[in-house]
Design a protein with these regions (language model features):
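Terminal accessory regions of large proteins
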Residues: 2-327
Length: 327
């Protein structure tokens, strides 16, 4: 359920189906071509994923079109606040009871507790979006070392500006707030006006400040180089950011994928060409399939195989002696 609620907040799913404002879509003809969007997705008039201009001003919730939501109670785009908005629109006066029941079923004290634990929402989400060896989580948590601050990003909205937006719209404002509170607490303690509570809060903020700077540094490192292309798949696209995921199994898989990328095992990917263009271009000279994948056939020294002309098979002609002369 919570995966659906987050999807509504990101604009993946159309909440009006859940409220009854729109009738459930008809079952498609089993022999018809597959639609671009699955049933229930927020779509435009052409049946494509909706964009901001496609959604009316009367739409029931605020959609996070940038594809970024913070786990931060002080931020207006906070994951608990966004999910609660969806719950309130769907269940109205039963919203609090539904939220409490969900927390009891999940065995957590609050929705935030469930989202913040590495073995909570993301572990369940990863399991649900994995099949055989394919792992394709849609909602990614990029976290500080302790998990005290997390940015949830929506895979299908990734672009080359996503990491810059994470820094400018979320991390920098948070750092400014932390610095302001630190300055105040230091002044209070310097004047001998504070006690154990203030000293503990000071330690917490100093740790948070250090971790936010580490998170910012890692994102700043990748922001100019990371050009996500969804055709590469989830694992390859997320691999450079492996340090920011804290579910052990997922981090291990991403790190292994990153090491394989560095070795050149996935040079067919757009990400590999973005990060190591010279290496990929050199390989394209002797690998025609790789050259075709990157649109670099002009670099390839291997000629395309000539098409073989199929010769028409001669039909065997059987002559029957109707006169009986071949007895």
């Amino acid at each position: 359920m919570l995966s659906y609620l987050i999807g509504c907040a990101f604009g993946r799913w159309d909440i009006r189906y859940a409220t009854g404002e729109q009738a459930a879509p008809e079952l498609p003809d089993p022999f018809a071509p597959l639609p671009v969007c699955p049933p229930g997705q927020l779509q435009n008039a052409q049946g494509l994923p909706a964009r901001p201009e496609d959604v009316p001003a009367t739409y029931p919730i605020t959609i996070q079109w940038d594809g970024i939501i913070a786990d931060d109670p002080t931020h207006p785009v906070d994951i608990e606040r966004c999910v609660r908005e969806v719950i309130e629109v769907i269940w109205k006066d039963r919203a609090n009871a539904i939220e409490q029941e969900a927390c009891e079923i999940l065995g957590v004290n609050s929705l935030r507790d469930y989202f913040r634990r590495p073995a909570g929402f993301f572990a369940d989400h990863l399991k649900r979006y994995s099949k055989s060896r394919r792992q394709a989580p849609t909602y990614w948590p990029l976290s500080t070392a302790s998990g005290s601050f997390t940015l949830w990003i929506y895979y299908h909205r990734l672009d080359d500006q996503t990491l810059y937006k994470c820094i400018q719209q979320f991390i920098d404002p948070k750092l400014a707030d932390v610095e302001k509170e630190l300055t105040h607490l230091r002044a209070v303690l310097a004047a001998n006006e504070g006690g154990a509570k203030e000293r503990k809060r000071l330690e917490e903020l100093e740790t948070l400040r250090r971790e936010l700077i580490e998170l910012r540094t890692e994102l700043e490192l990748w922001a100019p180089k990371w050009k996500p292309n969804l055709n590469d798949g989830v694992l390859i696209t997320a691999a450079p950011l492996w340090k920011l995921f804290h579910l052990p199994k997922w981090q291990k898989d991403l790190k292994a994928c990153w090491q394989e990328l560095e070795k050149g095992d996935y040079d067919w990917s757009h990400l590999a060409y973005t990060l190591w263009p010279d290496r990929v271009r050199e390989k394209c000279k002797s690998d025609r399939s790789l050259a075709i994948a990157h649109g670099l056939e002009d670099l390839c020294d291997v000629k395309a195989p000539e098409k073989k002309v199929k010769k028409a098979k001669k039909k065997a002609v059987v002559e029957l002696d109707l006169e009986g002369g071949n007895e």
